[in-house]
Design a protein with these regions (language model features):
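N-terminal [4Fe-4S]-dependent radical SAM core
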Residues: 11-58, 105
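Local cysteine-cluster metal-coordination motifs and their immediate loop/turn environment
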Residues: 60-75
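Residues at the beta-strand->loop junction immediately N-terminal to the Walker
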Residues: 58-60, 114-115
Length: 186
């Protein structure tokens, strides 16, 4: 992380000139790349400053319609584990209730519900999940639900997402080539 070097040197009280000289002389970084490091470090500092007292939440739904050939994530095939999704939501609600105590005085900047494929939940389960988020956490600035598999999206699920103020969905078909989709299990 080259920009971290710049940030660390700023924290040590070094001037931009001193940092630039050290990067070129000691680390053999080209002047153009040093300028890029300063730019990235400055942007990073602003983000870190603005992020004080804020948290981002990731809520994992480890179920998918099928297990894709290439997948390295922890996910479970719905055909095999379909009966476990309600029990998973029960456990998730207990965890949300417990964790919400720690976040009650913090500003939640973003919530990302990922997976697996969260939209592999049926409509009732998706409604339950988003209602739990509403119950335990304040409304974030950014609210995303991963809908990675287009075959899991229905008009009703989109209505549920909108009702719960989800501002963005992430759709990833991987490819538009049906032969490839068949090969990888999608």
């Amino acid at each position: 992380r080259p920009a971290k070097l710049v940030s660390d040197m700023w924290a040590e009280g070094k001037s931009d000139f001193e940092i630039r000289e050290e990067m070129v002389r000691k680390f053999k970084v080209s002047p153009d790349k040093v300028s890029l490091m300063f730019s990235v470090a400055s942007s990073e500092q602003k983000i870190l400053k603005d992020g004080k007292g804020k948290v981002s939440l990731y809520i994992g739904i480890p179920f998918c319609p099928t297990r894709c050939l290439y997948c390295s994530f922890t996910s479970y095939d719905m055909k095999r584990y379909n009966g476990k999704m309600d029990a998973y939501l029960d456990a998730l609600e207990k965890e949300m209730a417990h964790c919400s105590k720690y976040y009650q005085y913090k500003k939640i900047s973003s919530i990302y519900i990922g997976g697996g494929t969260p939209t592999s939940l049926n409509e009732q389960q998706l409604e339950r999940l988003l209602s739990m988020v509403d119950k335990y956490y304040s409304r974030p600035q950014e609210y995303t639900v991963e809908a990675g598999r287009p075959d899991t999206i229905t008009r009703e699920k989109l209505r549920i997402l909108r009702h719960h103020n989800v501002g963005r969905i992430s759709i990833n078909p991987q490819t538009l080539n049906q032969k490839t989709l068949d090969l990888i299990g999608r």
